[in-house]
């Protein structure tokens, strides 16, 4: 199988733990187990007693029921635990959805900027991938009239990230509904990477709230400060494809670890604690960035971010990859280039 190099991982992974200043990571400050127990008011002795008695056999094949209940609670009442499939991380979720839905003869519409899996995997499977790019001219919003020109009766999937990686732009309720209506007109699935969803004082809509063929992917990595659990999930409103996703997941990871799922369940049952903590952390960081930008005429933000990422423009005549490499070499500062 031939597939494009996963560019962001090839850039970040060798440097992530070496940089003095890591601005390339978008995970909200990770918690320790002790911090997690304290934040969630979990009895430490009882937790470790439960952990000590836990079997190290395979875990639950669709996910720990307690965890699935907590995941469903991240959405409106239209989402039920039955619609949840627990998988290995957000990357596992994205891969499983793509491998499940992409079939010969399908075309895929990918809304950029986007996570590379969403267009490189379909391309590697031989699908026609039609790219729609949100850019500075549109303030990184979707022009649905233009997007509709890429969609036809052979479009199997429209995929995107909301909040976006890296701009931080998030579709509002009206935009989610417009996207659902466009997909509905041709019977296409919508797959939305929602891993940054939740860093807001207001409820952020999910594609699964508004569309019967909506699928969303996420994990505990970013908003919930626990990438090390490697717990991710897929929510699918269309239960007719869940079995196919489970079959594909069996080729990847069989199931998740029960210890990891227990920790993730506790975290997600206390989602508001993590939303509040990490929204405050991100807002403080955004305030620092805004203040810094006041004295930097060569830099400007693309849009106001609703995630833990920020996408900046500069007007220097230097390729972004060269700029990022020189910044790391000279200042031990890690950023991701666009």
Cite the ranges covered by each PLM segment.
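Conserved PLP-anchoring active-site segment centered on the Schiff-base-forming lysine
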Residues: 82, 100-122
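Conserved C-terminal alpha-helix-loop-beta "cap" of PLP-dependent enzymes
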Residues: 312-338
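N-terminal small-domain helix-loop-helix segment of the aminotransferase-like
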Residues: 2-89, 269
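Active-site PLP attachment segment
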Residues: 210-244, 256
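Active-site phosphate-binding strand-loop segment of PLP-dependent enzymes
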Residues: 136-201
